[in-house]
Regions:
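Internal, well-folded beta-alpha domain core
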Residues: 49, 53-235
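N-terminal ordered "arm"
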Residues: 1-53
Length: 235
């Protein structure tokens, strides 16, 4: 067994709210979570290999150990914007909110990731060619529209390369001025049926979808009214 490492370059702004955030607000995470990565792999498996193969492979994908190597720089743009959302109560006839959707204001954050994003998967057999094929098919991470481009074919390595952080694993040291964020992952109880958006089954935060407090090696370098600039801390 070895580590399987893939590097992606963001080709669009990244955005991914924490699992507990509401639809009208919430800060964006600075990196994709293991949960988001595994859902992207599952999506690639369903599209390229079919639902039957994806269902059979899901327990293996779900239990993967995921490590991240963040881009060297990240710039977060924050703003308020208008969106349309379903009306919970019927609006008065003739009002500007008449119809199934109403206008409201929400808070949004978008992250510009400067540099390659590394993903590593632990305890992977060199014979697992299917996982390699699915990593080739990932084209976005986080919120839909956060497009990424694979920089080179995934490679195997005996040890985890430097600058990678294992989400949910034991931590021997971390930067004192790092950024703490909650990165979610799949619990062992998350079945393929619940992971499928077509089954109607819900995924419960804190049960099938668990969070890990993770110190990201980012240091705030500069900030203003509408932006925050982070730089990766390299030991």
């Amino acid at each position: 067994v070895a580590w399987l490492v893939a590097e992606y370059q963001s080709t669009a702004l990244f955005s991914l709210k924490p699992a507990w955030a509401t639809s009208s607000g919430g800060k964006s995470l600075l990196a994709p979570t293991p949960y988001a990565v595994k859902m992207a792999i599952l999506d690639a498996a369903c599209r390229t290999s079919g639902a039957a193969v994806a269902e059979k492979s899901w327990p293996r994908v779900r239990d993967l150990v995921v490590a991240l190597r963040l881009p060297e720089h990240a710039v977060v743009t924050n703003l308020f914007t208008r969106i349309l959302k379903p009306n919970r109560t019927p609006p008065p006839p003739g009002s500007q909110h008449a119809g199934p959707l109403g206008k409201t204001i929400c808070y949004r954050e978008y992250v510009y990731l400067d540099g390659p994003l590394g993903l590593a998967f632990g305890e992977v057999s060199r014979e697992e060619s299917q996982l390699v094929d699915w990593l080739l098919q990932i084209n976005y991470l986080g919120k839909r529209g956060g497009f990424v481009q694979l920089l080179a074919p995934p490679t195997f390595t005996e040890t985890l390369p430097g600058a990678f952080i294992t989400v949910g694993g034991s931590v021997e040291s971390f930067p004192a001025d790092g950024i703490v964020q909650q990165l979610d992952d799949c619990d062992a109880s998350l079945t393929f049926e619940k992971a499928s958006i077509y089954s109607g089954k819900s995924i419960r935060t804190g049960r099938e979808r668990v969070s890990h407090h993770t110190v990201l090696p980012y240091r705030l370098k500069r900030s203003g009214k509408s932006f925050s600039y982070y730089e990766r801390v390299d030991d």
